[in-house]
Amino acid sequence: EEKIRITPNGINVNGFLEIPGKTEEDQDAINVGAVLRVTPIKDVKTMIQAFAFAKKKVPKLKLWIMGPTDEDEKYAGECFDLVETLGIKDIIFTGRINVRDYIGRMDFTILTSISEGQPLTILESYAAGIPVIATDVGNCRELIFGNNDGLGDAGILTHIMNIEEIAQAMIKLAENPKERERMGQNG
């Protein structure tokens, strides 16, 4: 007889049924969303560097980093400086937001954490029908590939801190709208 049962995180998918979609300003962009705290464990610096490489190949890419920047102000400042040093356009730090106000504008989301449990941002992306790029940490592998559910993959899994691999994943999803749609439906 088991005395412990693990209950994974969950979200109310009904809250994602009627979310705003792309706006007029989004029509010429491929929006990449990152819903996270700007902290070292989320490895935002690797994300920024990978985005810089991907944007050279796909100029329409736009990265939305959505979440608080005040938890580790020094690290957030280093991220802002990195964007400036690399001279990257089209990276927006929104600060705290209501995820449902933005997620429908995204073509795919990304998570480059070096450690996770079961990230809510992946569940929120799937509830909105959006595929995910995530590092192979915590429960990300099972969330992306399923557990013998027969649905297929719902995103791309990468190694942690692998700038080239993460950039290639961004390029793949950016250049393949049908693949994005298929993966989004699988989520």
Summary of predicted features, one role per range:
Residues 10:
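Carbohydrate-associated surface elements
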Residues 25-42, 48-51, 64:
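Conserved donor-binding/catalytic core segment of Leloir-type glycosyltransferases
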Residues 76-96:
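Nucleotide-activated donor-binding/catalytic signature segment of Leloir-type glycosyltransferases, i.e.
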Residues 95-106, 127:
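Short acidic alpha-helix that forms the nucleotide-activated donor recognition element
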Residues 114:
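Aromatic "clamp/platform" in nucleotide-sugar-dependent glycosyltransferases that forms part
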Residues 131-134, 139-144:
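Short hydrophobic beta-strand element within catalytic cores of glycosyltransferases
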Residues 145-163, 172-177:
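Conserved acidic donor-binding segment of nucleotide-sugar-dependent glycosyltransferases
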Residues 172, 179-187:
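A short, well-ordered alpha-helix in the C-terminal region of glycosyltransferases
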